[in-house]
Amino acid sequence: MSSLQGKTLFITGASRGIGLAIALRAARDGANVAIAAKSAVANPKLPGTIHTAAEAVKAAGGQGLALKCDIREEDQVNAAVAATVDTFGGIDILVNNASAIWLRGTLDTPMKRFDLMQQVNSRGSFLCAQACLPHLLQAPNPHILTLAPPPSLDPKW
């Protein structure tokens, strides 16, 4: 694997979990990491914020940029992408990591929850790709990585 030294990653949902792990791995190579997530304020039920993630990225050897961003909102995505480009000069890799999951069956899924999953998992990933693509096309080796929420490990079809 080649180094991510000097590359810029725009990672959604990077304040915790898999997104944070990807950010820290990239930081160890010296990458610039834009942490785009809704978690600007600490939540006692969920670890991490965009600010703690940016600090961890810096401690790991990269440059971190904390961006409060709800990826369902086009204006917020566009502003976060613009801030990333203004700060780091471009975007090399988009990691669509943010997701909404609901590990219940169809009959137990309220439409409000279904709509949230579609808005985050589909619309949000599309919005981020659409906003990042003009900048990715200027990068020498651009990538878009889209992760999916984990499927139930005990399916009942």
Name what the model sees in each region.
Residues 2-88, 101-102, 112:
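Short-chain dehydrogenase/reductase
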Residues 105-106, 110-115:
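Substrate-binding pocket helix/loop in short-chain dehydrogenase/reductase
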Residues 137, 145-157:
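Catalytic loop of short-chain dehydrogenase/reductase
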Residues 92-93:
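Short SAM/SAH-binding signature in class I
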Residues 11-12, 96-97, 142-149:
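Structural signature of the Rossmann-like NAD(P)-dependent dehydrogenase/reductase core
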Residues 129-130:
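A short, exposed helix-loop element centered on a Lys and neighboring polar residues
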